[in-house]
Structures are given as structure tokens and as C-alpha cells.
Amino acid sequence: MNWELLLWLLVLCALLLLLVQLLRFLRADGDLTLLWAEWQGRRPEWELTDMVVWVTGASSGIGEELAYQLSKLGVSLVLSARRVHELERVKRRCLENGNLKEKDILVLPLDLTDTGSHEAATKAVLQEFGRIDILVNNGGMSQRSLCMDTSLDVYRKLIELNYLGTVSLTKCVLPHMIERKQGKIVTVNSILGIISVPLSIGYCASKHALRGFFNGLRTELATYPGIIVSNICPGPVQSNIVENSLAGEVTKTIGNNGDQSHKMTTSRCVRLMLISMANDLKEVWISEQPFLLVTYLWQYMPTWAWWITNKMGKKRIENFKSGVDADSSYFKIFKTKHD
């Protein structure tokens, strides 16, 4: 036997396998652990049925789509946001298209910045359903403005809403979960809680704070293995988050979503979220390329990440100033459609 030829064949096979995996990664829309769970892990249809799930920010975007997909799993839903009429609209659609009855859905108006109301809201949920199995911290707001054009009040608002409001509600729900020694705290963070980009630095700061808080909380709860703390970090997703983003003042929003076709569909993002929840994953990254690649670089090769982020950041500012979506030009090479 020609051992040298065999060795070369093995090397060639290894290189081909590496190439195949690289091509698969370039078309991936989630981190490798999450995609493995999607392929081989537990199904949301098996794990989440009959649970009581409280979703904040449920009136639009990811929270709205999450309500629709959860309603098909037979959970009991608590829908919270500030706009009651929008919550009622979401509830009606859940009843029309899901597997729930009127008694299975509670519309509970909630302002995350009104931290004094969170204890009463928690008691209302417990009175209605007797328990809270999953708290999904999804409420929040983004920002689109350069630092020198932004009032300090904008940064204060983002911290109060995205960070302190979420922490406050979690602290109200947590004693109940500790008493039962089980529950899931799922926080919709962002890949901007891992990386940082121009135009959204106040938003980045609030999301970095959330990630630090919940990573630390997970360690504090190590003696309660039945309580799962999960960070969900989506990239650009089709929603109205840009339209509602704060501009340079707290009284001004962007007011225009622009073209959203280059972003991940909300339904795909939420499906991957449910897979993460079913498999008790501690942190997941849900994003198409190139943001997924950049997130990996920030985690494992930060020097390279700085170089790429500077290049992408300049283009992001150019896009914003020209009136198009700040992230619109990054997806042309990598864009993949997922049903």
C-alpha cells in the first residue's frame, strides 16, 4: 500500500470537509450550537406546551410574532406593552390562528419605565394563572443618531427602558421562580450587546449592560439549576424597531423603516428563539451574514473584529446620511432566504 498516497487522500478529504463546513457557515443564520439544537435538539412543540409565558413588548415586531407562534403551541399567554389597542389586536389574531381560548390570554398593559407598577403587574399574572413559567424580556427601544448630535436624555431613556425596566421586572418575577425552583428568564438582547457600532452607541451600551447583568445573575442562581437564564442576541430583523428608534432627542423618532427586505424575517428569528428556549441554551446569536461572522470575530479574534467593524461602521454612517437603512449594503453577497 502506498502510505504517502493514502496520507494525501486523507488530507484532501479533510480540506474538502473544511471547505463544506465553511460554505455552510457562510449561509448560516445562527450560531453553531443553536443550529445543532435545531437539527438534533428538543422541539418547542414538545417542551413549551401548557406553560405560562409572559411576553413584554408584545404589541409589535419580535414580541408580536412570538405571541403568534406561542399561541400555536398551547401555552397560556400574558401580553404586555404600553399600547392596549395593539395588544388587543395581537390577542384577536392569536385566538383566530392559534390553539388558545379567551381564558388562555391575558392582556396586561405595562410601561417598563414605570418600575413602581411592576410588582402589581406580577401579582396580576400570578392571580390569573397561578404561576409564571417563562418571562420573555422583549420590550425596548433602539437609537439612530451620532453621539455629538444626541441629547444625554436619549441615553438616559435607553438605560431606563432597555436596562433598568427589564431588571426591575425580572426582580419582581424572580422570587416566584426561586420559590418553585424552576422557570426560564429569556431576555431578547442583541448582537449589539456583544459588538458595538456607530449611530446606536446608546442602544449598544444598554444591551451590553443587560448581557452583563444576566450573565452574572445566571451565576448567582447556580444553586437553582431549574431556573434557566437565556440571552437571545438577534441581528437585523424585519420589524418596526428602526421606525421607532430615537433620533437626537427623546421627542423625535426616525419615523421610517425603509427597505427591510435584506433583513432576517421575524418568523425565522422567533422560530430560532423557541428552539433556544426549548433547549435551555444560555446564549444564542441569531443573525445572517456578515453580522454573524463579525460576532464570532468579536468573541474570538477581537483585533480582526476592530478592523472589520471600522470598515463597516463607515459604510453604516454613509447609508444613514444618504437616507437608506444603515445596514442595507452588507447583505448582498451573503443573503439567504429561510422559510
Swiss-Prot record:
Record's keyword terms, sorted: Endoplasmic reticulum, Membrane, NAD, NADP, Oxidoreductase, Signal
Cellular component annotations (GO), alphabetically ordered: endoplasmic reticulum membrane; membrane
Xref: SUPFAM superfamilies: NAD(P)-binding Rossmann-fold domains
Molecular-function annotations in GO: all-trans-retinol dehydrogenase (NADP+) activity; carbonyl reductase (NADPH) activity; oxidoreductase activity, acting on the CH-OH group of donors, NAD or NADP as acceptor
Tissue specificity note: Found predominantly in the adrenal glands, liver, thyroid, prostate, small intestine, colon, stomach, kidney and brain. Lower levels observed in skeletal muscle, the lung and the spleen.
Matches recorded under InterPro entries: NAD(P)-bd_dom_sf, Sc_DH/Rdtase_CS, SDR_fam, SDR_family_member_7
PANTHER family: DEHYDROGENASE/REDUCTASE SDR FAMILY MEMBER 7-RELATED, DEHYDROGENASE_REDUCTASE SDR FAMILY MEMBER 7
Protein role: NADPH-dependent oxidoreductase which catalyzes the reduction of a variety of compounds bearing carbonyl groups including steroids, retinoids and xenobiotics. Catalyzes the reduction/inactivation of 5alpha-dihydrotestosterone to 3alpha-androstanediol, with a possible role in the modulation of androgen receptor function. Involved in the reduction of all-trans-retinal to all-trans-retinol. Converts cortisone to 20beta-dihydrocortisone in vitro, although the physiological relevance of this activity is questionable.
UniProt name for this protein: Dehydrogenase/reductase SDR family member 7
Taxonomic source organism: Homo sapiens (Human)
